[in-house]
Amino acid sequence: QGYSSAASDVYKRQVEATIALHYVFESPKDKIVFDVSHQTYPHKMLTGRKDAYLYEDKYDEVSGYSNPEESDHDHFIIGHTSTSISLACGLAKGRDLQGQSGNVIAVIGDGSLSGGEALEGLDYAAELQGNLIIVVNDNMICPLPRTMVECMRI
């Protein structure tokens, strides 16, 4: 019960955070990059694909991942962990090189933050001169050492 209850609470917070992101930012002009596939489900529901989650005969209308072929709100096919920051850095750099505007937001979970690609993305983000926002979804149930997330709270 403890873990399933915690998982349910975590997913509720993920849904609330995704709603807040869509309220504050103007997707798809502002580009939101989620880290792993399950983080994209509320995003998909908010961007016109909710029927695929509500009606069994429409389940096949969406993939289990973000997918640019499904929607302009998806910018990559994402399924692997620790990639959002690096991908968002690429979008931000491309936006800046083209003289465009708009926000780029990377959403990453605390467990994914310990991955090598996430750390490389943080290193590059520190040198990036453009507008890049990193949102850490700290659900506090990550089984990994918490030093990285604890350091980011300072």
Model-derived regions, located:
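Single conserved hydrophobic/aromatic residue that forms the stacking wall/gate
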Residues: 1-7, 11
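Cofactor-binding active-site loop characterized by glycine-rich and histidine/acidic residues
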Residues: 12-128
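Short beta-alpha junction loops
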Residues: 111, 138-141
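Asparagine-centered polar/low-complexity signal
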Residues: 123-124, 137-139
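Short hydrophobic alpha-helical runs that function as membrane-insertion/retention elements
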Residues: 132-135
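Long, well-ordered, tryptophan-enriched scaffold segments
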Residues: 141-154
